[in-house]
Amino acid sequence: MKSILSLIATIALVSLMGTFAWAETPDVETIVNKANHMALYQGKTCKGKVHLKIADSQGRIRERDLNILRKDVGEGDSRQLYMSYFKSPADVRKMVFLVHKTVEPGKDDSRWLYMPSLDMVKRIAAGDKRTSFAGSDFLYEDISGRSLHEDMHELLDSGNGFYVVENTPKNPGDVEFSHYVAYVDMKTYLPMRMEYFKETGKPYRIMEVLKVENIAADKSGKLYPTVTVSKVRNLETGSETVMTFSEIDYDLPVKESIFGERYLR
């Protein structure tokens, strides 16, 4: 009798533990929405300085310095305005990248690039969003963010401190990858590593976070876990780019009118 009671108790305990484990693991949509917020939508506004260090396969270095400014204008994680203003070197000085972000399914973000050498504003077509950002290994879409509606998401694993999520494009003909795998920190929900795969099943491009800092907003003192150093490696070309984010501040008053096309020049 004792053995039967012990067996029943063990089964009940295992079942209860399994229930707790299931309850503690959020569904994949919750994970990707939280990760998207942490990567792109922390604070109502954000500004800072960015340094890009670009190394080709032979170790030759090029560098870029720019200022960035962001403002959220929609309800929740929706409409967003983003601007990058290049400071150096001379060949890209005064170049401006402007994004009006939307999350409406079927609609693409509006992106513009001001090229001072030609005194021309170029509209970046949807098909060009996965091309190089200022000659670096980062892409335009890396900077402004990829819409969650463009991919199907599957939770592959939830161990070792990460949620591992596979993301497969709904329209594979629009992109150069077959899928990508994101490693999302279980505590902060920051995406810490992204591996992009071709149809061959081999990774060809890797984005990884090298440093995270808690940045306090000047006015409120609220802390925002922020990626301050990240790197992209192109496994096909052997090139890599390190992005360093500094002099960061959140929640400063920023006029929406600054993000108009007429401010590009």
Predicted regions and their residues:
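Gly/Pro-enriched, hydrophobic low-complexity segments
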Residues: K87, S110-Y114, M120-L148, S158-G260
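Bacterial N-terminal signal peptides
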Residues: I8-G18
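Short beta-strand micro-motifs enriched in acidic
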Residues: L69-G74, T102, L156, D185, ...
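Positively charged n-region of N-terminal signal peptides that target proteins for export
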Residues: M1-S6
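N-terminal mature ectodomain segment of secretory-pathway/periplasmic proteins
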Residues: P26-S117
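Long, terminal "pre-/pro-" and other extracytoplasmic accessory regions
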Residues: G43, H149, H153-S158
